[in-house]
């Protein structure tokens, strides 16, 4: 039986490589539900067709995991990625790198545009996993609305982490009103999970290391 993301988490806790955290475990329970729906022991041939047929008529097409820095969002997502069977067409990428690839494609193939990009991605990918989803300018905002709408229509599963809840994406941005339908799309088609908790694991890890500041002035003392 294929171990689920929560199985992997519990194993790492037992081995002492992770500290048990109820907030992380709660988020992983939701990821487990999606994982088991996708990989419930069905034959692995023709995965994408099976995936589309299994999610037809269902609203949830992915997970949007957000929360403060250092709460373990990336670790939780990576456990989901680690559990996915090796023959699945998976792409795990930092969101900034993904958007750089998007702009490169659109620049190189102006006639194909978003439609061509969607065809290319959907042929190569069943599941997209993004780390640190963020929208910084109006060009990206407009591209994302069209791109993600089309990818979700194609049946792709999207897993992403972000420091911001959907309603705060592109907050205060130019022409943000035109971006609001994309926020609606996220909330309608993805399970939105807040990973909260009082522990900042990133700060704790840095605190265990020797850290040096330069220049040595009053501000850094």
Predicted ranges, named:
Residues 92-125:
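Short glycine-rich substrate-engagement loop in P-loop NTPases that contacts/grips substrate
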Residues 76, 80, 94:
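Hydrophobic positions on the alpha1 helix immediately C-terminal to the Walker A/P-loop
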